[in-house]
Amino acid sequence: MERSNRKTRIGRVVSNKMDKTIVVAVETKVRHPLYGKIMNRTTKFKAHDENNTANINDKVLIMETRPLSKQKRWRLVEVVEKAK
């Protein structure tokens, strides 16, 4: 099964208090439509972490997947960088 067409995002883990679930904050830069200022937009995604490997402030790669619950549509692919 080809998975290259699924969306991926890189973000920081902001919560890991739930069992097998992490909250990942993904920051994107967006230009204001009228004034042109570049702003940071933050979107939070709930992602499935099967082995509870990610900790707070880890940089992680998540991938879109089938709906796993009411709010979870992403899963953890790898921990890119551990928190210091």
Swiss-Prot record:
GO terms for biological process: translation. One of its GO terms (molecular function) is rRNA binding. GO terms for cellular component: cytosolic small ribosomal subunit. The keyword rRNA-binding applies. Pfam families: Ribosomal_S17. CDD domains: Ribosomal_uS17 (cd00364). InterPro entries: NA-bd_OB-fold, Ribosomal_uS17, Ribosomal_uS17_bact/chlr. Keywords: Ribonucleoprotein, Ribosomal protein, RNA-binding, rRNA-binding. One of the primary rRNA binding proteins, it binds specifically to the 5'-end of 16S ribosomal RNA. Part of the 30S ribosomal subunit. Belongs to the universal ribosomal protein uS17 family. This is Small ribosomal subunit protein uS17.
